[in-house]
């Protein structure tokens, strides 16, 4: 299996086991859900009526005042009271076996390759850290939204792209299923291709 680099027009051989893998939609969905759940902090919490400070004394007598009966100022019906069904801290993290995770990444990368959304370049380097120069480089490649995967991310490339919502840049070790699916294109350097093949073997 071969792919042509868009800058030098040279042919690059790809490993069929990684770049021509059968697409498994269920596994990809599981990998995406697991990744997003693992990113959740789960720190949202409120207090029930028993946890809110104060409210131990009955506000007024049960009868004789003409007011509605009340047993505590921390009732959920009251201002500053507890929450009826208070949410608590919880762990949303899920486990996905390494083999399954690798297969999910293979599925996504292979599908990108099949649909023509995987773009290979011989190298990707920016002369400076300016965002306008980074955008100019991407416009020359006619790519409006992309994840750029490099073997090692340089400072200029990182600084030039970090303020743009339509572009993201990462090295091979930090590839994740959500980023691969989020952008229109995935731009990969030749050096990164070799590392991806080693990592997902």
From Swiss-Prot:
Keywords: Ribonucleoprotein, Ribosomal protein, RNA-binding, rRNA-binding. InterPro entries: Ribosomal_uL4, Ribosomal_uL4-like, Ribosomal_uL4_dom_sf. The keyword Ribonucleoprotein applies. GO terms for molecular function: rRNA binding; structural constituent of ribosome. GO terms for cellular component: ribonucleoprotein complex; ribosome. One of its GO terms (biological process) is translation. Residues 42-67 are annotated as: Disordered. Pfam families: Ribosomal_L4 (PF00573). Part of the 50S ribosomal subunit. Belongs to the universal ribosomal protein uL4 family. One of the primary rRNA binding proteins, this protein initially binds near the 5'-end of the 23S rRNA. It is important during the early stages of 50S assembly. It makes multiple contacts with different domains of the 23S rRNA in the assembled 50S subunit and ribosome. This is Large ribosomal subunit protein uL4. It comes from Legionella pneumophila (strain Lens).
């Amino acid at each position: 299996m071969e792919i042509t680099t868009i800058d030098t027009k040279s042919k690059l051989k790809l490993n069929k086991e990684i770049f021509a893998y059968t697409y498994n939609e269920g596994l990809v969905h599981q990998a995406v859900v697991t990744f997003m759940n693992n990113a959740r902090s789960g720190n949202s919490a409120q207090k029930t009526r028993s946890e809110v400070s104060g409210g131990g004394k009955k506000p007024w007598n049960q009868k004789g005042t003409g007011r509605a009966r009340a047993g505590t100022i921390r009732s959920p019906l009251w201002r500053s009271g507890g929450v009826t069904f208070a949410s608590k801290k919880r762990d949303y993290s899920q486990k996905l076996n390494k083999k399954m995770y690798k297969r999910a990444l293979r599925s996504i990368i292979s599908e990108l390759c099949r649909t023509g959304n995987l773009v290979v370049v011989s190298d990707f380097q920016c002369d400076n850290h300016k965002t306008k120069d980074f955008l100019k480089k991407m416009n020359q490649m006619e790519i409006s939204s992309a994840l750029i995967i490099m073997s090692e991310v340089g400072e200029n490339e990182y600084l030039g792209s970090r303020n743009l919502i339509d572009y993201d840049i990462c090295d091979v070790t930090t590839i994740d299923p959500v980023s691969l699916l989020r952008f229109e294109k995935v731009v990969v350097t030749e050096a990164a291709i070799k590392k991806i093949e080693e990592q997902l073997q």
